[in-house]
Amino acid sequence: MLKAVQILGWSSGLTISQRLTKTRKSSTVSFISSSLNLSSVTSSSPRRIFSFKPTRMSSSLPGSDPVANSPTFVSVQSAGDVRKIKFCQWCGGPTKHEIPDGEEKLRAICTHCGKIAYQNPKMVVGCLIEHEGKVLLCKRNIQPSHGLWTLPAGYLEVGESAAQGAMRETWEEAGATVEVISPFAQLDIPLIGQTYVIFLAKLKNLHFAPGPESLECRLFALDEIPFDSLAFSSIYVTLNLYLEDLKKGKLKFHYGTINKRPGSSPSDIRAFSLDYHLQP
């Protein structure tokens, strides 16, 4: 898992020019003030900042249980289903499910070689692409959330940095060549074992087109972002934080934990609280 303080001062002109290939509605809850005049919003260049202050946002739906949304409760509910691990990934032997000595969680342990299978979070990387007061979104052509809008993003692969993975995913999903400017947000989602790292980026040229995983790619004006048709809570949070920063005239780095409301539908992208929100 990336630590926020380790990536704050990161800045680069990384670009990706070669073609990469891959085998491979809701309540009216919003972070944005209703008085926000998007026509008066201007962006500023990201800055290196090394101090943080904690805040807490909530977009939980009415009637949500604050106890059920607590980090302790969510961590229990988000434990991986180790019982699905039937065989050892190293020797192929059958596994047993026990709590190893000195540990607290149930693990899959090979009955032949004795190795323990640990389940670790997956990192999702992507780009928030700015161009002349607009942001680039992709309409998904795959499940989950087929037909809904998202930032170009996907799983980080072995052998690439987070920034390289974000650029690769942008090329694969939007056919866009981008320059990464700075990290913008790290959002942990314990319930599903994912960490999102989103970078601010700019287009190297005006060419973009949907890849196999996208139905459409489009630049949206800030007041036209389809918040009622976004694919994931992480994208909903990222775009709202971005607009809030623009309103304040200063782009910042954000770290937070998205705790999904237990029992809510996976398609309900607003049933969450944003905890441990750290920002300059």
UniProtKB/Swiss-Prot annotation:
Residue span(s) of domain Nudix hydrolase: 120-243
Any GO BP: response to light stimulus
Organism: Arabidopsis thaliana (Mouse-ear cress)
Role, per record: Mediates the hydrolysis of some nucleoside diphosphate derivatives. Can use FAD and ADP-ribose as substrates.
EC number(s) recorded for this UniProt protein: 3.6.1.-, 3.6.1.13, 3.6.1.18
Reported cofactor(s): Mg(2+); Mn(2+)
Signal peptide: none
Subcellular location: Plastid, Chloroplast
Upper lineage: Eukaryota, Viridiplantae, Streptophyta, Embryophyta, Tracheophyta
Protein name: Nudix hydrolase 23, chloroplastic
